[in-house]
A protein has these predicted regions:
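Charged, amphipathic alpha-helical oligomerization/scaffolding segments
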Residues: 12, 16, 118-121, 125
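Short, contiguous alpha-helical
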Residues: 28-88, 120, 124-175
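Short helix-to-loop capping/linker segments positioned immediately adjacent to catalytic or ligand/cofactor-binding
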Residues: 28-32, 107-116
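Extreme N-terminal tail/first-helix region
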Residues: 1-16
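A structural motif
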Residues: 89-101
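Acidic/His metal-coordination segments adjacent to aromatic residues that form catalytic metal sites
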Residues: 2-5, 85, 99-113, 138-142
Length: 175
């Protein structure tokens, strides 16, 4: 795979999420629960933000020649959370739901604007790290698949959720 082609695809796929969020529109709608259980669009964005921050930090560690090892004890998980401010999503100790609920709760009282701004900045960090990586480093660390999984493949899961919710909340809205 060519790095520039991958970055172009990454940005194109990203635009699909941004267009959908913009179509949902008003702040009040973005914070209404029901997109995914009790989650709002804001909660989905916070969830994506935390997973992207995890990815961005691992990419930066790779660029710095550091080695990430998933947490294997609860003490290590707690220390990771204290250091990074998000769960160690790579730890085999975590189930699927607990870290996601923690993330949503962490951002509960953070404004929508701040969540969106942080998420945009983290996405830019991912693109920047990708641009800095050599093709050898990308291949050695399976970066294309990791970035795809942590960004646009993840977006697509939640785009479906948001579209389903939006179709019920605003059935006459332009699709």
């Amino acid at each position: 795979m060519n790095k520039q082609l991958f970055i172009s695809r990454l940005i194109r796929e990203r635009e699909k999420l941004e267009l959908l969020v913009n179509r949902v529109g008003f702040t009040r709608q973005l914070t209404m629960p029901g997109v995914l259980g009790k989650w709002s669009v804001k909660d989905v964005i916070a969830h994506l933000l935390a997973h992207e921050q995890y990815l961005a930090d691992r990419m930066e560690e790779i660029l710095q020649g550091e080695v990430y090892l998933p947490c294997k004890t609860q003490t290590a998980l707690d220390a990771f959370l204290d250091e990074f401010g998000y769960p160690d999503f790579g730890s085999p100790l975590l189930d699927d739901d607990t870290p996601n609920e923690w993330v949503v709760e962490r951002y509960r009282n953070v404004s929508l604007e701040d969540v969106v701004t942080q998420e945009i900045n983290v996405f830019a960090s991912i693109v920047s790290s990708l641009e800095k990586m050599s093709e050898d480093l990308i291949q050695k660390h399976n970066i294309y698949e990791r970035v795809a999984h942590g960004t646009y493949k993840h977006y697509n899961e939640h785009i479906r959720d948001i579209k389903r919710w939006f179709a019920v909340k605003a059935p006459n809205a332009k699709k």
